[in-house]
């Protein structure tokens, strides 16, 4: 599993995104507003979705977005706001970042809500790959609603690309984070590591923590470093959405460990198998996981071929000794090396952050393959763990 590319989306999810008819300026503007609204939602088991109801005169009647599991979906949110304001939605259009759902979960199907509201024109960016929710477009067309798709598809895919991948693979999308010196050390010989990274790198990492669903470390990291694993601002205070704090390993977590925090949002995974850990996290609604260390857990995920994205903060520092970023990956010859390529998405492949470099990589495509399937190397079974 790796991040989807726009060339493969049609095959992967059956979307008509890249065969869509042209859209006018008003429709484009509405989709941009819907994308901006979607970005306000919380990440997790559900995708980020935004919707804008457009009147027959082209004005935006209401903008909605999904605020999390159990709350109104974006379409229902926008329709509800428009109705509360006394708007007549008969003949109106709705522009949505994801195909309207067609199932009854905690909330009713959005396709039916659109039909009931009298909306006659639906534009959405990409198809919903989640089988229970898919099929809204078919229902809408059967009811006589005009349906078009593909507007701003690339932007909509980028907004939820990790969620799309997680749904397709039925496991969390895994971002592996390493903060290291030029000689690949994550701590000095005496165990000190705060801080190898620049303040700018630390701030970037905390911003990333605020966008993920969960952060994972091993029990050894908890016992030695006693991390908080929260998303914090420049003053060191927890700020914004906080990720689930997960710990992997058999050893117990002290009651006074900082990781417990005030909210106690901690999950202890009593396993050393990365695949088992991912299964448990997926069952808890985690779709985007960041693995932070230490070296054993980083190496275990890499050796198992379960890393979809690498973010490396490289400090212009040399130690010569100390804790290496990675342990043995079971690779004995160059031909079996794990190959990675630069990923220009989400901030760029290479960024300068203060004195550091931020490197963003994804698994390289298999050189002998004509498709874009990532090259998975290393053992197929987990090794190590904390």
Label the predicted regions.
Residues 2-18, 22-46, 62, 82, ...:
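Enzymes that bind and transform nitrogen-containing heteroaromatic metabolites
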Residues 53-155, 300-302:
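Zn2+-dependent cytidine deaminase-like catalytic core
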Residues 55-56, 168-169, 362-364:
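Active-site beta-strand termini and strand-to-loop segments that position acidic
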Residues 122, 126, 157-159, 185-193:
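Short N-terminal helix-initiation segments at or just after the protein's N-terminus
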């Amino acid at each position: 599993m790796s991040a989807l590319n726009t060339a493969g989306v049609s095959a992967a999810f059956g979307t008509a995104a890249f065969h869509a008819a042209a859209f006018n300026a008003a429709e484009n503007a509405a989709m941009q507003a819907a994308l901006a609204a979607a970005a306000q939602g919380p990440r997790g088991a559900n995708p980020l979705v935004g919707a804008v109801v457009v009147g027959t005169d082209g004005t935006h009647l209401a903008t909605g977005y999904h605020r999390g599991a159990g709350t109104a979906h974006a379409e229902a949110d926008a329709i509800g706001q428009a109705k509360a304001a006394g708007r007549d939605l008969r003949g109106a259009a709705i522009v949505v970042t994801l195909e309207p759902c067609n199932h009854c979960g905690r909330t009713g199907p959005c396709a039916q809500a659109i039909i009931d509201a009298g909306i006659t024109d639906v534009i959405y960016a990409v198809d919903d790959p989640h089988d229970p929710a898919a099929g809204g477009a078919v229902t809408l067309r059967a009811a006589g609603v005009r349906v078009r798709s593909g507007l701003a598809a690339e932007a909509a895919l980028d907004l939820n690309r990790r969620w799309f991948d997680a749904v397709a693979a039925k496991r969390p999308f895994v971002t592996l984070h390493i903060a290291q010196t030029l000689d690949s050390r994550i701590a000095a010989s005496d165990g000190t590591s705060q801080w190898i990274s620049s303040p700018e790198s630390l701030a970037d990492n905390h911003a990333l923590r605020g966008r993920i669903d969960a952060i994972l470390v091993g029990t050894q990291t908890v016992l030695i470093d006693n991390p908080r694993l929260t998303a914090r601002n420049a003053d060191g205070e927890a700020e914004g959405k906080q990720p689930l704090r997960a710990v992997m390993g058999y050893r117990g977590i002290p009651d006074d460990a900082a990781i417990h925090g005030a909210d106690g949002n901690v999950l202890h995974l009593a396993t050393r198998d990365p695949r088992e850990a991912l299964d448990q996290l997926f069952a808890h609604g985690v779709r985007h996981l960041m693995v932070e260390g230490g070296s054993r857990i980083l190496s275990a995920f890499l050796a198992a071929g379960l890393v979809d994205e690498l973010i490396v903060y490289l400090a212009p520092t040399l130690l010569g000794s100390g804790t290496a970023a990675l342990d043995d990956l079971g690779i004995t010859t160059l031909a079996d090396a794990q190959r990675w390529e630069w990923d220009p998405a989400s901030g760029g492949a290479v960024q300068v952050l203060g004195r550091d470099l931020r490197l963003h990589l994804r698994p390289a495509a298999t050189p002998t393959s004509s498709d874009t399937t990532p090259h998975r190397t290393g053992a197929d079974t987990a090794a190590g763990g904390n």
